[in-house]
Swiss-Prot record:
E.C. number(s) listed in UniProt: 1.1.1.51
Protein name in UniProt: 3-beta-hydroxysteroid dehydrogenase
InterPro entries on file: 3Beta_OHSteriod_DH/Estase, Lipid_A_modif_metabolic_enz, NAD(P)-bd_dom_sf
UniProt KW NAD keyword: yes
Residues at the catalytic site: 154 (proton donor)
Function: Catalyzes the degradation of testosterone into androstenedione.
Catalytic activity: testosterone + NAD(+) = androst-4-ene-3,17-dione + NADH + H(+); testosterone + NADP(+) = androst-4-ene-3,17-dione + NADPH + H(+)
CDD domains, per the entry: 3b-HSD-like_SDR_e
Amino acid sequence: MGDPTLRTDLGRVLVTGGSGFVGANLVTTLLERGHEVRSFDRVPSPLPAHPKLTTVVGDITNGEDVATAVAGIDTIFHTAAIIDLMGGATVTEEYRQRSFSVNVEGTKNLVHAGQQAGVQRFVYTASNSVVMGGQDIVNGDETLPYTTRFNDLYTETKVVAEKFVLGQNGEQGMLTCSIRPSGIWGRGDQTMFRKVFENVLAGHVKVLVGSKNIKLDNSYVHNLIHGFILAAEHLVPGGTAPGQAYFINDGEPLNMFEFARPVVVACGRKLPNIRVSGRLVHKAMMGWQWLHFKYGIREPLVEPLAVERLYLNNYFSIAKARRDLGYEPLFTTEQAMAECLPYYTDLFDTMVAQGAQPAVAAAPKS
């Protein structure tokens, strides 16, 4: 175990996926703290011009683009990824390769380029799902083994990539660690609550899945960013973070529907109170997913992984992050909800006006 008092300045920072939800919020926070930041993404940055912000538009699977992005950088935060929440044996090879090319090969490109460019610190964005294999997890910690049961490509690619990143710790002088968020929410979220809103507007939410006593945890985006930065600051020789993975969340396990209910009510809608067996719904969605890939019918209403999170406890301890990094959530769930509720009601109203077009299933997670 390293010394938690050892910390370092981040120097010049690269944020991959800097145009996305997490990435743009991270870039903004780093700029507010006075850092020199470079944003790397496939699309231009939505952020206003800033004297300490430069942007690189490019593809993480392109070696030349990646080399340009990492040149002169001291710390890399890797948030870019594709979210494919379906998987299993029936997925097409094209579907599988799309995820692996970005989430695994793209990560390897970035690590190797960073090593060659003299980057000192590399913080990877994984997921709490890397240890979720269809079992109840209550206050799970980082000693849990990686899952070997993959029902979605996102988890599968995150397991492979995290193992690689942590295995590269210390190679050519670059220290690495990994952050495992839970469901990420807050201003800019186009995934968690957008999916809830799509189903509410489509009239699909007739019942609730699983018991009210089942809990999961979430990661408010500014709590997550706080954890990212602390981890990077502790990537120092003899420090606590090198080669380590950390669960970073809000520290307040909640039932998903009870978490979402205030938002849905604020949007002028209601959630039902009738609940049904999650295991039955999960089996139905697994069958539907198989038919989707086998015969091309429409995607399931809810991905099997999402159903598991509704009927199985899945929440994780932040004790290791507290001990090693000094992490404490900056915002309670109540405080965070008050801050971002106007954003979510505006998003809902926009979706109503636009006819609630579905989010792209494999949108980059940034």
